Amino acid sequence: MGMRMMFTVFLLVVLATTVVSFTSGRRTFHGRNAAAKASGLVSLTDRRPECCSHPACNVDHPEICR
């Protein structure tokens, strides 16, 4: 095996290890649940018309107040 091929195999192993550890860690720390909560908060903000009159909300979500 050449040096370039060995480097490519090394990168693939590192990438595979990173992907496996990242996805297994998400389940342990309830990453999906946190994403669902964040999505719920964003949709809750979409339903509130008073967000446009609140400066902090208006800055965080300018797409709502167009």
Swiss-Prot record:
Pfam families: Toxin_8. This is Alpha-conotoxin-like Tx2. Residues 22-49 form a propeptide. The cysteine framework is I (CC-C-C). Alpha4/7 pattern. Residues 53-55 are annotated as: Ser-Xaa-Pro motif, crucial for potent interaction with nAChR. It comes from Conus textile (Cloth-of-gold cone). Residues 1-21 form the signal peptide. Keywords: Acetylcholine receptor inhibiting toxin, Disulfide bond, Ion channel impairing toxin, Neurotoxin, Postsynaptic neurotoxin, Secreted, Signal, Toxin. The keyword Repeat does not apply. Expressed by the venom duct.
